[in-house]
Amino acid sequence: MTKYIFVTGGVVSSLGKGITAASLGRLLKNRGLNVTIQKFDPYINVDPGTMSPYQHGEVFVTDDGAETDLDLGHYERFIDINLNKYSNVTTGKIYSSVLQKERRGEYLGGTVQVIPHITNEIKERVYRSGRETNADVVITEIGGTVGDIESLPFLEAIRQIKSDIGRDNVMYIHCTLIPYLKAAGEMKTKPTQHSVKELRSLGIQPNIIVVRTEMPVSQDMKDKLALFCDIDTKAVIEARDADTLYAVPLSLQEQNMDQIVCDHLKLDNPAADMTEWTALVEKVRNLSKKTKIALVGKYVELQDAYISVVEALRHAGYSFDTDVEVKWVNAEHVTAENVQELVGDTDGILVPGGFGDRGVEGKIVAIQYARENKVPFLGICLGMQLASIEFARNVLGLEGANSSEINPDTPYAIIDLLPEQKDVEDLGGTLRLGLYPCKLSEETNAYNAYNEPVVYERHRHRYEFNNQFRPDMEKAGFVFSGTSPDGRLVEIIELKDHPWFVAAQFHPELVSRPNRPQPLFHDFVKASLTNKESK
């Protein structure tokens, strides 16, 4: 029978519930269990697709085109699985589904209520995740903090699941904070006690408490928490700030967290073999080289907006025993006069995805700098589109060339709406989303990176290169090295007379893994190291 683990949070948000859930998933997978994982977000948006990155961080796209929470990126990178649309559920999705059923008459004229209709819909999403993946274990993270009004239906639903399928098949893990008061020189357990009290008042008794802390937790403190929270002392797990995220699974294993889980759920799988993971962490801690990459974006104040890009750069660096330092460059501040000052000390330049016109001209200036000064360049989504516009303006001399997204009246729409997007009015869920094939041309940097004729990558865009300009740009040295199999859509571009200048319409960062870097990122970091050594 499938086992269910629920991860909740208390005291404050951003405690690392997602990393805790992902780390436990990795440990259970290494015990030979088939693990899947999902995130429940209590906000009323259907998905984060139309939310500002300042509100929510990056939007992580799954193979099947779901726009999801950034925690799914952590899940995929840690557990090394590809998740699907069932892995992220929001209050908006739940209510939307229930209202559609009500309109269809599926409730037989009954009064639709939070209990049982909303809670039943939530439970069905939990069970469906296990059914769709044939999982041995389903880990579900509940977003937000215990005590939030928005979380109550989710907490009630997961409380009911224990009654539905039996206590041996359900486990609750609660993540809290033990603050350290520097002035008093003390750590305080009271916030955790109150958080657990709140959770218990809702009918949920946690089986494990994971305490986030910047200082070591003494045995006396663990005993105190165990007494007041009514759990075994061994089930108080310390989650101290780590030097690398990838060390967290090892820390949890040292404290026997996965064994406690298996004992409670009556799973007799052998201990997790973490030899390869330990070697990875040792490598990360002992990188001998450095390279600096300029990330030119418009959301640089909130680095979570580009979290998968940064992780993909790090993964690529691990292959070369290299610590990749990211220099955050606000695209709105970049001008032709100061670009040398802002990016001149870096070994490579990366322009990530985005929407809208803010910061676009600064990104184009940075791209021009990379092209003219032979600096390794990687463009992603909007970065690829702007690389095309920069070339059209400054090499072909098409003054005013632009994207019709940014300037609908441009005389040269190098980037234009996909044909199927012309009549679309809604913003949410209407982009070209998910995994699509890309055919590569031989003897190109893209082909050399992948070493395969056809690759599959995840997309999230509405605009595309305008094929009207392909012949003239090809004559001028612009290479269309990746296209859709029918040749209609441009997927990858690069430059002939440049050491390494590649840009992709898709989002390669979404499939990178710590032990298996994404090929374009791998070769971009390699080119950046070569550039550094040649200076």
From Swiss-Prot:
Binding site for CTP: S13, D148, I149, E150, K188, T189, K190, P191, T192, Q193, K224
Subunit record text: Homotetramer.
Gene: pyrG
Natural source organism: Bacillus anthracis
Binding-site residues for ATP, renumbered to this chain: S14, L15, G16, K17, G18, I19, D71, R240, D241, A242
Glutamine amidotransferase type-1 domain mapped to chain residues: 292-534
Notes on activation and inhibition: Allosterically activated by GTP, when glutamine is the substrate; GTP has no effect on the reaction when ammonia is the substrate. The allosteric effector GTP functions by stabilizing the protein conformation that binds the tetrahedral intermediate(s) formed during glutamine hydrolysis. Inhibited by the product CTP, via allosteric rather than competitive inhibition.
Annotated positions binding Mg(2+): D71, E141
InterPro entries given in the database record: Class_I_gatase-like, CTP_synthase, CTP_synthase_N, GATASE, GATase1_CTP_Synthase, P-loop_NTPase
Source organism phylogeny: Bacteria, Bacillati, Bacillota, Bacilli, Bacillales
Protein name, as recorded: CTP synthase
Disulfide bridge map: none
Catalytic residues as annotated in Swiss-Prot or TrEMBL: C381, H507, E509
EC number: 6.3.4.2
